[in-house]
Amino acid sequence: MLSPKRTRFRKQHRGRMKGISYRGNRICFGKFALQALEPAWITSRQIEAGRRAMTRNVRRGGKIWVRIFPDKPITARPAETRMGSGKGSPEYWVAVVKPGRILYEMGGVTEHIARRAISIAASKMPIRTQFIISR
């Protein structure tokens, strides 16, 4: 699973996902890509599940680039704990994704194979996405 090697602070505020993604919204490496259409937190497990599904589908043919990285720690309190006594401990990591962000890219395969692999990865995501091709 993806997570930062070290961070400046252990815990972060939740924040909010306003507007659209101005960074990471163009295809840079491959020819085909999966683009987010909704804002969401995508966990490192979901990113890994999508990557594995694509890799399994493409086999040795193409190359896959993961364009998002989970750098936000999400804290959780133990079940049946009384209120107060501070913030919970970090449980897992998420990537903050805004609409327009490229999640995965793929190259070195035909459009048919890429579409099939990316649609399987899209089913692992908690948001609506679209398949795009670079011109």
Swiss-Prot record:
Q: Does the keyword Ribonucleoprotein apply?
A: yes
UniProtKB keywords: Chloroplast, Plastid, Ribonucleoprotein, Ribosomal protein
Location of this chain's protein in the cell: Plastid, Chloroplast
A Gene Ontology BP annotation from the UniProt entry: mitochondrial translation
Q: Name one Pfam family in it.
A: Ribosomal_L16
Tree of life domain: Eukaryota
User: Is Glycoprotein given among the entry's keywords?
Assistant: no
Which InterPro entries does the entry link to?
A: Ribosomal_uL16 (IPR047873), Ribosomal_uL16_bact-type (IPR000114), Ribosomal_uL16_CS (IPR020798), Ribosomal_uL16_dom (IPR016180), Ribosomal_uL16_sf (IPR036920)
Any GO CC annotation of this UniProt entry: mitochondrial large ribosomal subunit
Q: What is the protein's quaternary organization?
A: Part of the 50S ribosomal subunit.
- Give the family this protein belongs to, as stated in its UniProt record: Belongs to the universal ribosomal protein uL16 family.
Q: Which HAMAP family match?
A: Ribosomal_uL16
The name this protein carries in UniProt is Large ribosomal subunit protein uL16c
- The organism is Coffea arabica
